[in-house]
């Protein structure tokens, strides 16, 4: 580190919804010559993922309380004190000019210590309903940023930081106008597979006449791909030119851009990516998400006619088939354009600029 180089510490962990937007900001700051160090849990996904991106890590041991047993709750004071001590040592080693909290359990003790030691804290809340940690820390932070308007009081609406390629796709009007023939459907189950989608979508497609049936790319996660294939075969649909079943999609920007319609869950990052690309979506929120935040995430687009929201309890093959029959490429294009109009494609730059400003620096240019 040079004597004039500034340092950002990113605190994030636990799930991709916290880690990936943090990585987007980290890379933006590195491109501006900043040193970036990550604070995470050695047992979290960040411990494996972040070092692959060339970002050094500091570790704090701290887990959540929600849904845990009495033993965990009784041990909370000790675990919190230990995590605060580990956070203090990490902050003293790294000496960050600004600390960015992107969520995850470790953000609570590390955020408290950041404020108590006089370092500037910037918070970013990815979901439409803020978690308890950010609700507390928002009262102490220098700047509070949100992906969805109204998620936290007196916060700045920046949107969710996303990968650069997602924000650079061709506008939906041009993409949809250039297509003809069958509709293109992308079903995204994620790494967990989204069993409800894997079961209902094949049966819904089987209810459509062959000339009504869209071309399908269905992603289901490696552990679920065999079951998914069985579901399609049971519905009388075989893999071929119109049905592609895949365990993973490397290039989500192209996958979204090539689709007329996406059927998927409504995690914060998924909603942000779909809006950034501008593609029609039918959201089926994960029913067991904390505070049912996936429903309110989806409502942000659905209430503006930029997506359709169907609760999992209401989803059936018959309902989905009937809805698909009523769609055209023009109707989906209109939905996609409304979605794009609600996007915050410069969110990564905005969050990075705030971090730089809090540290008394400027950020040059855009991604």
UniProtKB/Swiss-Prot annotation:
UDP-N-acetyl-alpha-D-glucosamine binds at residues 15-17, 127, 163, 191, 249, 294. Keywords: Cell cycle, Cell division, Cell inner membrane, Cell membrane, Cell shape, Cell wall biogenesis/degradation, Glycosyltransferase, Membrane, Peptidoglycan synthesis, Transferase. It is found in: Cell inner membrane. InterPro entries: GlcNAc_MurG, Glyco_trans_28_C, GlycoTrans_28_N. One of its GO terms (molecular function) is UDP-N-acetyl-D-glucosamine:N-acetylmuramoyl-L-alanyl-D-glutamyl-meso-2,6-diaminopimelyl-D-alanyl-D-alanine-diphosphoundecaprenol 4-beta-N-acetylglucosaminlytransferase activity. Gene3D superfamilies: Glycogen Phosphorylase B. It is an enzyme of class 2 (transferase). Disulfide bonds: none annotated. Belongs to the glycosyltransferase 28 family. MurG subfamily. Cell wall formation. Catalyzes the transfer of a GlcNAc subunit on undecaprenyl-pyrophosphoryl-MurNAc-pentapeptide (lipid intermediate I) to form undecaprenyl-pyrophosphoryl-MurNAc-(pentapeptide)GlcNAc (lipid intermediate II). This is UDP-N-acetylglucosamine--N-acetylmuramyl-(pentapeptide) pyrophosphoryl-undecaprenol N-acetylglucosamine transferase. The gene is murG.
